Amino acid sequence: MMNKLSEEEIQDKLKKFDGWTYAKKSIHTSFQFENFKEAFTVMTRIAFEAEAQQHHPNWGNVFNELEISLSTHDADGVTEKDFKLARAIEDIVESTN
């Protein structure tokens, strides 16, 4: 099991993630895309990465908007696993621009 990060550790790590915030034991972000197809394409790519990492986001999609929250349920908070997936998500989104 991964160790839960302290709020100080989380805030420090978030400095490297533009647009991500910490609240309610999770890190959160949102993205806006050109259209639904682009949003869904990114979601599909994230889904494959999440499966590969065996770590899955809590997310929602309405048309061209995607909201993502990451936490590690076993740790009841945020761990390194969340930041690893967040980095992969950032890379996926960046590669679509």
Curated annotation (Swiss-Prot):
It comes from the Bacteria. Keywords: Lyase. GO terms for biological process: tetrahydrobiopterin biosynthetic process. InterPro entries: PCD_sf, Pterin_deHydtase. One of its GO terms (molecular function) is 4-alpha-hydroxytetrahydrobiopterin dehydratase activity. It catalyses: (4aS,6R)-4a-hydroxy-L-erythro-5,6,7,8-tetrahydrobiopterin = (6R)-L-erythro-6,7-dihydrobiopterin + H2O. Disulfide bonds: none annotated. It is an enzyme of class 4 (lyase). Its EC number is 4.2.1.96. Belongs to the pterin-4-alpha-carbinolamine dehydratase family. This is Putative pterin-4-alpha-carbinolamine dehydratase. It comes from Christiangramia forsetii (strain DSM 17595 / CGMCC 1.15422 / KT0803) (Gramella forsetii).
